[in-house]
Regions:
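Helix-to-loop junction immediately C-terminal to a conserved catalytic motif
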Residues: 1-2
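Hydrophobic anchor residue at the start of the ABC signature
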Residues: 100
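A short, proline-enriched helix->beta-strand linker immediately N-terminal to the Walker B motif
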Residues: 105-109
Length: 185
């Protein structure tokens, strides 16, 4: 984090003031987030299980806890049967679900999904967004960044439209047509 410094205002996330966060606090702050990227970022030499477990191992989580949490989260995303597969043996949608499982395995209060459907076909895109909705219903705050108007319009959620760093819209699905130019521009 701290890729950008705000020109005005205060940015607070999960109780951290990002304007004043100290360097030594950044690792702890990052552990409070789950992040899913457009390009999956899976380690090709590791199995599905190990890709997910990696997020726990780097934070020194006990092996016993890893053995409990990884199968649980793989089941949550529908990949329990693929735990021993490698990324190149999976479809794009399955790879994205592995990335999602890895982001969720630490049970973060906030999940940021940055164009999570950018590299998968439209039908799988709806499955991924439905999975994000289910995660949200279970209590995790989900922030999804996307330019896909059609994808956003199928789900009844709050939509904030940002253009060049400025909020230009904040409302529901019914307000999207008003902001359509920002999605198509």
């Amino acid at each position: 984090m701290r890729e950008e410094t705000p020109t005005k205002g205060i940015v607070k996330v999960n109780g951290y003031n990002l304007n004043k966060i100290k360097k030594r606090q950044i690792p702890q702050f990052r552990r409070s987030l789950g992040v899913v990227f457009q390009d999956f970022r899976l380690i090709p030499q590791m199995t599905v299980y190990d890709n997910v477990a990696f997020a726990l191992r780097v934070t020194n989580v006990a092996s016993r806890s890893i053995r409990q949490r990884v199968p649980y989260v793989l089941g949550l995303v529908g990949l329990a049967a693929k735990a021993r597969n490698y990324p190149d043996q999976l479809s794009g949608g399955e790879q994205q679900r592995v990335a999602l499982a890895r982001a969720l395995v630490n049970n973060p209060p906030l999940l940021i999904a940055d164009e999570p459907t950018g590299n998968i076909d439209p039908e799988l895109s709806f499955e991924i967004v439905e999975l994000l909705n289910e995660i949200n219903r279970c209590g995790t705050t989900v922030v999804m960044v996307t330019h896909e108007h059609e994808l956003v319009s199928r789900f009844n959620r709050r939509v904030i439209t940002i253009n060049h760093g400025n909020v230009v819209g904040d409302g529901g699905i019914d307000d999207l047509d008003e902001w359509r130019d920002f999605y198509e521009g």
